[in-house]
Each structure stands twice: as C-alpha cells, then as structure tokens.
Amino acid sequence: MKSMHRGISTMRNFAVCVFTVILWLGCAVAKADTVLDWNEIAVNTAIANGQSPFAQARFAAIAQLAVFEAVNSITGDYQPYLGTIQAPRGASVDAAAIQAAYRVLSTYFPKSVTTLDTQRANSLAAIADGQAKQDGIKTGDDAGKAMIKLRTDDGSSPAQFKTPGAPLAGEWEATPSCPTVGGVQVGAFFHWQHVMPFGIASAEAFLLDPPPALKSSEYAKAYNEVKTVGSHNSTERSQDRSNVATFYAASSPTQVFNQAARQIAQAQGRSISENARALALINMAISDAAVAAFGTKYHYATWRPETAVHNADVDDNARTDQDSSWEPLIVAPCFPAYPSNHGSLSGGGAEVLRRVYGEGGHAITITNPAFPTLVYHYTNFNQILADISDARVYG
C-alpha cells in the first residue's frame, strides 16, 4: 500500500525522458513577469472550472507549451516543440506569451472568458502600443491555436470507466466515491492511460513492477502502518500529519509545483525564455506522469486500503487483522490504489524542477486558499515529496 516512494522514484526516471524533449537551458537575462503571471492564471482557471488533477495537468501543459512556442519563435533560444510558428522580427515576447495563454484558456474554459478578458486587457496594457505588440499578439494566437489543434482528439474525452470483476483478494473493488453507470459502480479515469502524452512514448513504457504480494512481509508492514495511522479516527496520527494529509488531498501537483516554480524563477531572476521553457517541461512531466500512473493502476488493479482492511480475512497473511468498520481519513478516489497518482505526478514535476533549479537552497512557500491557516515552508523538493508521501499514508 505504501507505494508512494516507488511511484516517485519511477517518475524521476520518467521526468528525465520528458526533460530531453527540449534542449538544455541556455543563458538569458530578461525578466519574465508575463510568463509567470499567466502560469498562475492558467492553473487557477483550471481549478476554478472544477477540473480533476489530471485534467489540470493536461490543460497547464497545453497552455505552457503554447506560451513556450510563442516565446521561442521570437527568441529562438531553444529547439521548438511544434516548429510551425513564424514570428515577425521584433515581435513583443510579452504580448506573445499573454495571447498564447489567453487563447488556450479562453477556448477550453468559456465560462471564464469575462475574467480572462479582463486579465488579458490588464496584462497587455503594460505593453506599449505599436507593431511589435500587434505582431506579438498574432504570434501568441497562432501558437495557442496550434496547440489546441494538436491536442484535438487526444484521448482525454469522452470519459471511459472500468467495471470491476468478481471480488478477489487484492483486486480493486469499487469504493463509496465511485460513480454508478448502468446500475453498477465503476472505476473512473480508465481512459486516461490512453491520453496522448506530451513527451513520452506511452504509458506502457513506464509500467512499474507489481506491488508487494499479499503474503509478503512488505505488504503486512505497509498494511499495518496505513491501518494504524491512516484511519479516520486514528489516535496514532498527530494533528500536523492530519493537516498535511488534508492539505495535500486538496492541493494538486499542478497547483503545488507550479507555485514552487514561480517562486524560484522569481528568486533566481530567470528570463522570460527560460521560464517559458521550464514551465512547459514541468507541466509536460506532470501530465505525462498521470498517463503513466493510470497505465500501471489499471494493469494491476490493486485494491484500496479500505477494501484491504475490510477483507483481510481472505488475504492469506497472518500478520494482517480484519476490521470491517475501518474508514480512511480521506475518502478514497475511484480507481485502483497502486501506484499513488499524487506521488507519480509530484515525482515527475519535482524531478524537472530539480534539474532546472537545483535540489536545495530555495525558499518555497506552498499555500492553498481553501486552507488559509495552513502554510508550508520548504528549502528543497525532497521535503515537499516527503510531506506528500506522508499525506498518502496518513490520509
């Protein structure tokens, strides 16, 4: 059950593959407020529109790749992702970044267009009127439209579900949060393993080893840890770990690691070109990690902790005791347990951040408006991953 660390480790390797899609960082000196501002707008818009963590990652990747392609078509600093956008000489990089993000977000989130129009107008007002501004807007619009076209029919919709088979020890069964289709509770996001990746070949390329066997001591150790500290009424879980579990259950990897990236980019004075590229890579990694994680999840179809605890009498392991009344602190999501989605997406995002900015020496503050009293400070990415790992065990 405690498969979080395995997911993070594998997603490190996965993130390296994504990272090689575009060339290594070069040197530049310009400031990049527009790229960072519209990254925050992109993430917040997806959240405000009620998107799942996996859809958030996909939309952020599309928006950031559009921004990167728009900026890079003007600066020429890196190998392009699309390579089809032609920018006039002297086009405004800031206008291009603003319009690229706006085009993607306004297309996917029509309910937010009024807010996005205001944000776009405010951002563009800071740029002097003239041909450079107009050329930048045209370049950004072209990049946004090109990314939208590329991702049409990418497998993210329509939703497909998995009907559970006959109950077997260790096999995933529907939990209370699962939707009902045709009178049967089904597994959600079954189709996400087939979403077209941004940088990797396929989910199959990152299939993990199977989870620990039910009879193993490793399984029993993880089982008893989760049963003890992860229950709804656990007396062994501190308030701090309860807070971490609740906070990170509501804070998606896209939200967390883009927040960290913006803070570090500002602190390090990264250029607009560097920021556009880094944010594209980070969100490619997070999104593709979701594809890979769902591939492994539905390949092994491992039962959730509450199913495991309720049915410990059939797991053939003398070191696990059944408790038919056990409930987790956090309601289980409706898909198999192994590997942790949160761990996989976080591991992918953190590894790219690590390679772009370095592991430590940072001043990172992670917040979520839904929990105004909870503020987490970190100096390196391993600290963030440790809290996320704990969150999936304690919650």
Language-model features and meaning:
Residues I8, V18-F19, G348:
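A periodicity- and composition-biased signal for non-globular, repetitive helical segments
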